[in-house]
Amino acid sequence: MEGRYNVKMFIAATIAASVSLAPVLAADDEPAKRLDEAAAVLSEVMSAPDKGIPLDLLEKAHCIVIVPGLKTAAFGVGGKYGKGYLSCRREGNRGWSAPATVRIEGGSVGFQIGGSSTDMVMLVMSERGSSKLLDSKFTLGVEGSVAAGPVGRTATAQTDVQMRADILSWSRSQGLFAGVALEGATLRQDLDDNDTLYGKRLANRHIVTKGVKAPAAAARLLALLNGFSAKERTD
């Protein structure tokens, strides 16, 4: 009788432990899940004929930032919060670096409807912008100029403002994809998410510049980046 009681207690304890661990495991999966979402955003906005990011701009970019599912606070209020990834060109233009995590806060995008979820993509077009981006904190429009990016097959219709900008940015919300200047938003590295992905609290600059091996979850995103870059070179 006592043995049967002990077995029941063991089973109950095991179930309780697995339930208590579920939120932790789910939280650990979030950065990997977000990488998949970032890859989906990149695939969709780069594949849209005449309505996406020009391939020649991606080819010239030093870094890219993708934030899937950026949340907007309320109608008429510009506050936003979201998490995403950045990747930069490897030295010698040999593909793209392992992704580093970012959080974006604040800023304003005028046409957004409050409470909506928005996908953001940014291309960093200058060395100055890419260097600042890898700091622990980076404010758009303050530490690097930002402009709404052009939409289309090529960037031949770029304005002077776009050509001079350190960063070009785009937004997709409720099916609408357009260039948008995300002034005042702050990008911060997320050491906790880096720890989850890499097993160490690595700084973004270290991940990008020291040849850190990308996690398996980043394979699709990096394959897309390399593929779209190669397409521009061969078209």
Q: Which residues are covered by each model-predicted region?
A:
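Short linear motifs centered on Gly/Pro in flexible linkers and helix caps
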Residues: 1-2, 24
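Small-residue-enriched, tightly packed secondary-structure blocks
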Residues: 27-235
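Bacterial N-terminal signal peptides that target proteins for export
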Residues: 2-12
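Bacterial N-terminal signal peptides
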Residues: 12-21
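Sec/Tat signal peptide C-region and signal peptidase I cleavage site
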Residues: 21-27
